[in-house]
Amino acid sequence: MPNSLAGDQVPNPTLDAIGLVDWSLRNAGTSGSTPGLEEGGTDPWTFSQLKNTDQLKEVGTASKLHQVVSGFLKACGLLGSLYFFICSLDILSSAFQLLGSKMAGDIFKDNVVLSNPVAGLVIGVVVTVLVQSSSTSSSIVVSMVASKSLTVQASVPIIMGVNVGTSITSTLVSMAQSGDRDEFQRAFGGSAVHGIFNWLTVLVLLPLENATAALERLSELALGAASLQPGGQAPDILKALTRPFTHLIIQLDSSVVTSSITSNTTNSSLIKHWCGFRGETPQGSSEECDLSGSCTERNSSASPGEDRLLCHHLFAGSELTDLAVGFILLAGSLLVLCVCLVLIVKLLNSVLRGRIAQAVKTVINADFPFPFGWLSGYLAILVGAGLTFLLQSSSVFTAAIVPLMGVGVINLERAYPLFLGSNIGTTTTALLAALASPADTLLFAVQVALIHFFFNLAGILLWYLVPVLRLPIPLAKRFGDLTAQYRWVAIVYLLLTFLLLPLAAFGLSLAGGSVLAAVGGPLVGLVLLIILVNVLQRHRPSWLPRRLQSWAWLPLWLHSLEPWDRLVTGCCPFKAYSNSHMTSKVAHCYENPQVIASQQL
């Protein structure tokens, strides 16, 4: 099946694909079927299409042995692919740090810009995208607050931006499933729900925080009520498993990014070349490095004449610049990540079949019996928080959820609370890490971690507590429906959400608050007006003037993606899917709900 990012040659959705036009108003200049629902097919959001090739027949001893061996090999392959997938994410993060850390340091040094809330938000987003690590971005903020380079009030928008920027990883992972229309629809919608939740929370809490400083005051109250004592480090289970492999590829000096911000040392390399010393240390004890190179980081202060130990990784002693190594690691890690994702998806489709698939889906997506069904989502939040806490990485957890959504194991309604729990889990990890800070920076580190925690907790109260306000779910479905037919929309979404729109807002904020209000105010008002008109078109068209009851009076390119799709398809050498490919699916027994229901355990 071709991996296409161009538009599909199927009935094209208009703006109704994202909920902006009433489907009953088909005189708007375009026509099409309900987004996300194939002709004569099933809705990929509500029905998983895991393939079942099992035959209900008696098998002999040799066949049973073959099945056992095959199942064991598939399980080993799945675990191995998952391991290298996680390692590739770690190396990808290192690559982004090598490519963008110096730029991130330069951005953070402009204190005048950081005092602007909108600029602070954008800086948090861009820096987290550049370094691919919310932990690194948070540690930078903590260091700046502790060194008095940044006030706690100015750090709040940056923390919000860090929360938004970390959702790009799952979106990038979903792109690897663009070869299959239904899988990409579910995977991209699942990754988008995380980013939509973060952006909606920012849109509500940033103005509120700017007006009332609610999060800052709440964190101060929590600090006043607690008796803080420096604690131990947070558990590091996942790193303990992946470090033996990733440290053979690359090792970075994590202190260089922070030191480049709090001081003027900007010429140090992020790559760790020296891991320690042979012989006696200044304290009189000998020091040796193990094969992974994990030992005391004193390479920055070592003099050339000392007998130093070279680290054991591919780029130790290399004369390549950080930028060159970053590009090499970026290309290699992306290649390994895509290969591992393809293997994971194929193995999941092979393993999760028939009764096994139904049992797994039932357990993961099941609700408690009435009247306690509402507790299922909150249990999922706790599970997401706990697993993220154990993995020590929200990016790894969310990136692992996306392929499972693509193959239909986890539905969007269950993945949403898992993502919310992941947000909480990463803040509790940051809180434990803050408690391990030195005494002089303990209060600042804990307050920043508490602000991050209360921000995500407020987001859950806003967009999950009341079921009717769970807006990220329908919005994510609309995005998934749209990208399923126009794959280039996924790239546009990535560029707009994490790069172009933040940079545009950043540029306007540099010109001053009045310029930002003069330009951004009318644009925001226009967007809100369009949303209001489209909601009324869908539900109360009689309330609108006749001219506004449809968008037929506008040029086609203003209310339909079809002209844009023709432009992109003509300019880009992507092969589109054909109508026959999309509509030629045959309903097998494993795609029949009645047959599956009869095979339930």
Curated annotation (Swiss-Prot):
It is a multi-pass membrane protein. One of its GO terms (biological process) is intracellular phosphate ion homeostasis. Residues 97-110, 209-324, 391-447, 509-512 are extracellular. InterPro entries: Na/Pi_transpt. Glycans are attached at N210, N264, N267, N299. One of its GO terms (molecular function) is sodium:phosphate symporter activity. Its main location: membrane. It is found in: Apical cell membrane. One of its GO terms (cellular component) is brush border membrane. Disulfide bonds join C275-C311. The keyword Cell membrane applies. Coiled coil: none annotated. Keywords: Cell membrane, Disulfide bond, Glycoprotein, Ion transport, Membrane, Phosphoprotein, Sodium, Sodium transport, Symport, Transmembrane, Transmembrane helix, Transport. It comes from the Eukaryota. Residues 1-75, 132-187, 346-369, 469-487, 534-601 are cytoplasmic. The chain crosses the membrane at residues 76-96, 111-131, 188-208, 325-345, 370-390, 448-468, 488-508, 513-533. Involved in actively transporting phosphate into cells via Na(+) cotransport in the renal brush border membrane. The cotransport has a Na(+):Pi stoichiometry of 2:1 and is electroneutral. This is Sodium-dependent phosphate transport protein 2C. It comes from Rattus norvegicus (Rat). The gene is Slc34a3.
